[in-house]
């Protein structure tokens, strides 16, 4: 009878777990059936990716009115899990981005959006918003890489992040693919410095119209694997940040993760600075633009006892956005542009604008560089701000 009672209680617990969102998150066995179904659908999509890409190319051909004939190179660097609140470039007390600060100080055309958000908190979902058009401007699904391809751009994809979905849905549009990381998941220890010689090589070969996309592993958990182990902090580890974490009741584990995250940020500072410097070195005599953003942010202990991906706090969506160009035809009024907020799901419109690809649908109001830019805060961000409990940023 006792065993029967225990079995009955376990059955109730199992049923209860289906009902509770939090339990579904903590005990994924309860959602395996639905997950299997979703993966089956996605697998079928990937199996037919060539047909899907043909649809995207047909759509692009139908909507492009002017492809732009001027040779130029655009370098798009996409980071991972970078929260601008942990960048000294954006006012963080730890000196985590000294090289970017130096570039910002000395380069007139180097700009940062003071406010920037992703509208998704995970990589694939963020890519889907960054490189695809939302339904509003098009009656059918649009893909910015298809537009670039139809406009005559040579597309190079350099990746240090192994992701089947990203490869299937995005890298297949490229003319050249350089995959530097064959190990997926959080346990990969592939250093982002691998992309630097590949970027230099791609820039040396660039001719005509070229789009180079560099996908970094960035600050993807595990943070301790995102920087060389001999890298040392340039700040006192018992500084005001550490004290704030203690005062806010952060666990010892999260205090350690915070230190690892900031060290990973210091390493990323070097990588990003070098991608910029390499791009600039190869910009003589040709129009070149450099764009950086993170796919999404990460919660770093400011709002919750949490370090990492977060769908429920603003840190999960808070990102940096950086831009540089040597093009004289792009009007750069730093004070005005840097005040403009940026949203990741509007990236594709700005890329079209830089490339000079004109379309049957309007996009000027969503292009950060355009004089007709009109900011609308993402509803996801507005809702999170309403529920923000701790506004203190240290």
List each model region and its residues.
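A long, amphipathic alpha-helix that forms part
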Residues: 197-200, 238-290, 342, 346-348
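Short loop segments at secondary-structure junctions
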Residues: 325-330, 357
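Active-site-proximal alpha/beta segments of enzymes that process anionic O-linked groups
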Residues: 14-76, 81-244, 318, 343-375, ...
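Short beta-strand segments
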Residues: 117, 157-159, 211-218, 262-268, ...
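C-terminal, low-complexity/hydrophilic appendages and adjacent surface loops
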Residues: 314, 388-394
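Active-site rim elements
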Residues: 132-135, 185-186, 254-269, 276-280, ...
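Membrane-interfacial entry segments at the cytosolic side of transmembrane helices
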Residues: 2-9
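Histidine-centered active-site microenvironments of extracellular/periplasmic hydrolases
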Residues: 91-95, 280, 284-327, 364, ...
């Amino acid at each position: 009878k006792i065993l029967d009672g225990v079995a009955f209680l376990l059955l109730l617990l199992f049923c209860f777990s289906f009902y509770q969102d939090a339990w579904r998150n903590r005990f994924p066995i309860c959602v395996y059936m639905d997950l299997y179904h979703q993966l089956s659908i996605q697998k079928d999509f990937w199996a037919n990716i060539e047909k899907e890409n043909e649809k995207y190319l047909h759509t692009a051909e139908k909507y492009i009115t002017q492809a732009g004939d001027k040779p130029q190179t655009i370098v798009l660097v996409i980071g991972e899990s970078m929260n601008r609140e942990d960048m000294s470039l954006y006012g963080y007390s730890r000196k985590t981005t000294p090289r970017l600060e130096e570039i910002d100080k000395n380069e007139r055309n180097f700009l940062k959006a003071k406010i920037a958000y992703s509208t998704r908190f995970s990589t694939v979902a963020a890519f889907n918003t960054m490189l695809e058009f939302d339904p509003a401007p098009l009656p059918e699904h649009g893909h910015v890489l298809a537009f670039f391809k139809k406009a005559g751009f040579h597309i190079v994809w350099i990746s240090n992040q192994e992701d089947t979905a990203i490869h299937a849905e995005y890298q297949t549009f490229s003319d050249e693919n350089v995959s530097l990381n064959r190990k997926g998941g959080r346990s990969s220890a592939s250093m982002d410095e691998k992309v630097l010689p590949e970027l230099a090589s791609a820039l040396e070969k660039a001719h005509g119209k070229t789009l180079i996309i560099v996908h970094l592993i960035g600050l993807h958990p595990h943070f301790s694997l995102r920087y060389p182990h001999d890298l040392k902090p340039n700040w006192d580890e018992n500084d005001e940040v550490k004290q704030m974490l203690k005062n806010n009741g952060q666990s010892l584990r999260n205090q350690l993760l915070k230190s690892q995250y900031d060290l990973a940020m210091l390493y990323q500072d070097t990588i990003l600075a070098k991608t910029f410097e390499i791009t600039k070195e190869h910009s003589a005599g040709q129009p070149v633009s450099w764009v950086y953003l993170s796919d999404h942010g990460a919660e770093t202990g400011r709002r919750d006892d949490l370090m990492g991906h977060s769908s429920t706090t603003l840190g999960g969506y808070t990102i940096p956005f950086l831009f540089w160009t040597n093009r004289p035809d792009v009007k750069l009024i730093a004070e005005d542009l840097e005040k403009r907020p940026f949203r990741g799901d509007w990236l594709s419109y700005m890329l079209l604008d830089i490339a000079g690809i004109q379309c049957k649908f309007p996009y000027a109001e969503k292009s950060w560089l355009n004089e007709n830019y009109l900011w609308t805060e993402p509803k996801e961000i507005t809702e999170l701000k309403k529920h923000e409990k701790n506004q203190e940023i240290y």
